[in-house]
């Protein structure tokens, strides 16, 4: 089973990506990354209501890509959840992002630029040799 982390997966493109992978790639296990745990759990519920058998192929992971601590804790959670595998991930899909210019440049950079860097720094060591990053 190929495990793939999708950040920003509780709505929009991220949620659609998770659903598409579940529908079209039965050999995948999706780690649904969400900054907001409640919305992440709601996304899991929505997916499992659509298709109950997906429940065995899903996990919600609390991760705020704008926070070093949150990303590092999330990486440790993945390691402990799949401790039988030294390299528990096949893929990382860096989807988390914000688009509002009204909040200013700094928060946008923290998520859209530095967030990708943080996630890659923390999770690339967990990738299989043939793993992929998007």
Predicted features, each with a name:
Residues 1-31:
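Canonical Rossmann dinucleotide-binding motif of NAD(H)/NADP(H)-dependent dehydrogenases/reductases
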Residues 3-6, 88-93:
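Conserved hydrophobic beta-strands of the Rossmann-like cofactor-binding core
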Residues 26-42:
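Conserved glycine-rich Rossmann-like NAD(P)H-binding loop of the short-chain dehydrogenase/reductase
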Residues 37-38, 62-76, 113:
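The beta1-alpha1 cofactor-binding region of Rossmann-like NAD(H)/NADP(H)-dependent oxidoreductases
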Residues 95-100:
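Conserved NAD(P)H cofactor-binding loop of Rossmann-fold oxidoreductase domains
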Residues 103-118, 134:
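Catalytic Tyr-X3-Lys loop
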